Amino acid sequence: ELAVEWGTAVTPEAVKEALDADEDIKAITVVHNETSTGVAAPIKEIGKVMKDYDALYIVDTVSSLGGDDARVDEFGIDICVTGSQKCLAAPPGMAAITLSDDAWDKAENVNPNTFYLDMKAYRKSGDKNPPESPYTPSHATIKLQKLL
């Protein structure tokens, strides 16, 4: 765990120090925008640091996607997660996740210890024509699909 003082953002230098101190780190997770304080982490700069390491770069953009700059590919983000209920100002109940090619490669070689969050199941169902959810979708997801 890399803790920072309340109301401050993690720095790229602190991330680099943590990664240098422990070569077994498999992933770094950063909250882009901390809702209660409004503090935004420098995800672009942290992404530059992450390019030198094999660890996955995971960013929580629940309260920032759509309102702040979060260019997933350009910033080197391997996994980006968001929800509909905060910055997107949509009804709650939907989540979106992106995986980089590197994250997909790593996911293919892991047997997840979770049923619902098995990304391989989502990919397999998403490749169908028409795409579908591997599990019962939320009512908001069904409505979104109809609108699109």
Language model features with spans:
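Active-site cofactor/substrate anionic-group-binding motifs, chiefly glycine-
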Residues: 1-9
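Short, acidic/turn-prone active-site loops that include or flank metal/cofactor-
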Residues: 4-5, 63, 84-87, 102-103
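Conserved active-site segment immediately N-terminal to the catalytic lysine
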Residues: 73-85
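Active-site C-terminal subdomain of aminotransferase-like
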Residues: 87-148
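Short beta-strand segments
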Residues: 2-3, 29-32, 82-83, 98
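Glycine-rich, charge-decorated loop segments at or immediately adjacent to ligand/cofactor-binding or catalytic sites
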Residues: 65-75
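Generic secondary-structure signature for well-ordered alpha-helical cores
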Residues: 17-24, 51-55, 77, 99-104, ...
